[in-house]
């Protein structure tokens, strides 16, 4: 906010410079508008000629108007300054608690989110460890299953080989039984043929000859055949018993192996079913944990995006407030400088008023015609007058109030 003091022209006019006695300091006067008033013109003329030239009333009226305008501007600036201070105080009281509260809530929310993130990370690590353990267990069970499957295949191949051997032995037994039956039939046929031939010979030779021969007794063929038959039957029976005993032993062993293999196979099948159920349950749990992790990651991403946008908004708000505060500070500094300038102007005006008041009080005195008489009159307070009447004003008492 800028203020214009409404002063007269700030530059020195030619009204001073047109006088032959005006010093160079008049062109660089420090008081705004000091060279524009008739009093300053009469000052130059007064120091040179020692008279008022009849413009005291006009000068006093002009000075009074200037003083009133300056005082009004000073009061206006003081009121504006007070209003600005109240406005700044109200804004600071309104905004500071809001910013602090919002920061505290954001910090609490960020800490809660960080705790949730840490808990989620630990839970994910625990689930990863459980998944790794389940994978190792499933690999172990898979290895056991493959081993037992290879053992089962070996046992099944052995059973198939024993079944082939059993079939061969069964065929062998049937062949031997068929051979025994054929031998029995052949033996029976031989017996019948032999009996028929013996009977035929007996019939032919029974009534014709009666020859007695002193020789060794004849061999009984029936007895020989019976002995041979009994020997063959005993041999066949022995072979049959041995084959049956061996077959029974092998069959019993195979049955035991088949029973044990079937029991192991059933136990393996039950274990495989349980392992499949466990693997399915672990896969379902793994998929659920993956979904939970994805949802948590999405939630975390959304929360980070939301809170980052909120933080950016808060940062922008803080930046705006800081820029406003900087502008307000700069305005306050500028107004303070203007206020100091106005105070200086006021002090100089008061000094000038006091000077003119002293001049008005001493206007009844007779002024001498000597140009330096007035300076000799005020020599009591300021010292001796200088030899140059048109020198710088700082050497004269009444003009020393301008601070030159």
Swiss-Prot record:
Gene3D superfamilies: 1.20.5.170, Single helix bin (1.20.5.500), Vasodilator-stimulated phosphoprotein (1.20.5.1160). Residues 57-91 are annotated as: Coil 1A. The keyword Ion transport does not apply. Residues 1-56 are annotated as: Head. Residues 220-363 are annotated as: Coil 2. Keywords: Coiled coil, Intermediate filament, Keratin. One of its GO terms (cellular component) is intermediate filament. GO terms for biological process: epithelial cell differentiation; intermediate filament organization. Belongs to the intermediate filament family. There are two types of hair/microfibrillar keratin, I (acidic) and II (neutral to basic). Pfam families: Filament. Residues 92-102 are annotated as: Linker 1. Residues 204-219 are annotated as: Linker 12. It comes from Pan troglodytes. Residues 364-404 are annotated as: Tail. This is Keratin, type I cuticular Ha3-I. GO terms for molecular function: structural molecule activity. It comes from the Eukaryota. The record marks 305 as: Stutter. Residues 103-203 are annotated as: Coil 1B. InterPro entries: IF_conserved, IF_rod_dom, Keratin_I. Residues 56-367 form the IF rod domain.
């Amino acid at each position: 906010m800028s203020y214009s003091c409404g002063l007269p022209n700030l530059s020195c006019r030619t009204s001073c410079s047109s006088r032959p006695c005006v010093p160079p300091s008049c062109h660089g006067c420090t008081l705004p508008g000091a060279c524009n008033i008739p009093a300053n013109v009469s000052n130059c003329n007064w120091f040179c000629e020692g008279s008022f030239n009849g413009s005291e009333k006009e000068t006093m009226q002009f000075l009074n108007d200037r003083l009133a305008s300056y005082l009004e501007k000073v009061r206006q600036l003081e009121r504006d300054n007070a209003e600005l201070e109240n406005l700044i105080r109200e804004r600071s009281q309104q905004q500071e608690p809001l910013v602090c509260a919002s920061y505290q809530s954001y910090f609490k929310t960020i800490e809660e989110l960080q705790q949730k993130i840490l808990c989620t990370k630990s839970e994910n690590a625990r689930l990863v460890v459980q998944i790794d353990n389940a994978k190792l267990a499933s690999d172990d069970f898979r290895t056991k299953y493959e081993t037992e499957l290879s053992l089962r295949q070996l046992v099944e191949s052995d059973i198939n080989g024993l079944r082939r051997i059993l079939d061969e032995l069964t065929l062998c037994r049937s062949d031997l039984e068929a051979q025994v039956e054929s031998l029995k039939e052949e033996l029976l046929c031989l017996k019948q043929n032999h009996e028929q031939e013996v009977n035929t010979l007996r019939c032919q030779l029974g009534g014709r000859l009666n020859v007695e021969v002193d020789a060794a007794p004849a061999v009984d063929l029936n007895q020989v055949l019976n002995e041979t038959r009994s020997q063959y039957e005993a041999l066949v029976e022995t072979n049959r018993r041995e084959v049956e005993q061996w077959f029974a032993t092998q069959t019993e062993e195979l049955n035991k192996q088949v029973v044990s293999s079937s029991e192991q196979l059933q136990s393996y099948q039950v274990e495989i079913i349980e392992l499949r159920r466990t693997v399915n349950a672990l896969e379902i749990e793994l998929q659920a944990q993956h979904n939970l992790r994805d949802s948590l990651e999405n939630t975390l991403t959304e929360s980070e995006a939301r809170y980052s946008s909120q933080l950016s908004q808060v940062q922008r708000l803080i930046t705006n407030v800081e820029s406003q505060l900087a502008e307000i500070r700069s305005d306050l500094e500028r107004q303070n400088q203007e206020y100091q300038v106005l105070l200086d102007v006021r002090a100089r005006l008061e000094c000038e008023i006091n000077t003119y008041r002293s001049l008005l009080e001493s206007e009844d005195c007779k002024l001498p015609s000597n140009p330096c008489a007035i300076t000799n009159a005020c020599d009591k307070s300021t010292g001796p007058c200088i030899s140059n009447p048109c020198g710088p004003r700082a050497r004269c008492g009444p003009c020393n109030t301008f601070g030159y």
